[in-house]
Amino acid sequence: MADARRAPLKDQTDVSGARVLIVEARFYDDIQDALLEGAVAELKAAGATHDVLTVPGALEIPAAVAIAIDSAEAAGKPYDAAIALGCVVRGETIHFEIVSMESARALMDLSVARKFPLGNGIITVNTDEQAWARAKPGDLNKGGDAARAALAMLRIKRRLAKA
């Protein structure tokens, strides 16, 4: 497995106080715990707050993000960014392809259409071993990567809004 490569982000626009939504699919509780741990650590380091919304599986994540964004906006407490966390392990049918591709496409569509910072931390793997290597904060830390991506996009949005 390749080592994780993370170039330091040069844009250090302040994101402290940002309100971030984490939507997690708890299909694999133990793997999800590791993904969530990595994401939360990154948000805390950036001074962001977060809410966690749990859904049954990865296919439900995009709709839950959209519903939560609208509800928070209507309540006058909008989210600044969102993070999608989940795990899809390949099985013997095409269900893996459907879940992984459709959840990714829906998240991308949502992010682009709404111009909304979103980090996709739905890991797609062939084995449990691959899932653990990607989920653990001490290894590839894909939960942390998703949080960093969401915060990076939020920095871009905030910086360009000031321009």
Swiss-Prot record:
Top-rank lineage group of the source organism: Bacteria
InterPro entries cross-referenced by the UniProt entry: LS (IPR034964), LS/RS (IPR002180), LS/RS_sf (IPR036467)
Pathway the protein acts in: Cofactor biosynthesis; riboflavin biosynthesis; riboflavin from 2-hydroxy-3-oxobutyl phosphate and 5-amino-6-(D-ribitylamino)uracil: step 1/2
E.C. numbers: 2.5.1.78
Molecular function GO terms recorded: 6,7-dimethyl-8-ribityllumazine synthase activity
Residues reported in the UniProt entry to bind (2S)-2-hydroxy-3-oxobutyl phosphate: E92, T93, R134
Active site (UniProt): H95 (proton donor)
Keyword flag Transferase: yes
Biological process terms in GO annotation: riboflavin biosynthetic process
Entry-linked Pfam families: DMRL_synthase
EC top class named in words: transferase
Chain sites annotated for binding 5-amino-6-(D-ribitylamino)uracil: F27, A58, L59, E60, C87, V88, V89, N120
Gene Ontology, cellular component aspect: cytosol; riboflavin synthase complex
Reported function: Catalyzes the formation of 6,7-dimethyl-8-ribityllumazine by condensation of 5-amino-6-(D-ribitylamino)uracil with 3,4-dihydroxy-2-butanone 4-phosphate. This is the penultimate step in the biosynthesis of riboflavin.
Family the entry assigns: Belongs to the DMRL synthase family.
Database matches in PANTHER family: 6,7-DIMETHYL-8-RIBITYLLUMAZINE SYNTHASE, 6,7-DIMETHYL-8-RIBITYLLUMAZINE SYNTHASE DMRL SYNTHASE LUMAZINE SYNTHASE
Protein name: 6,7-dimethyl-8-ribityllumazine synthase 1
Organism name: Rhodopseudomonas palustris (strain ATCC BAA-98 / CGA009)
GN (gene name): ribH1
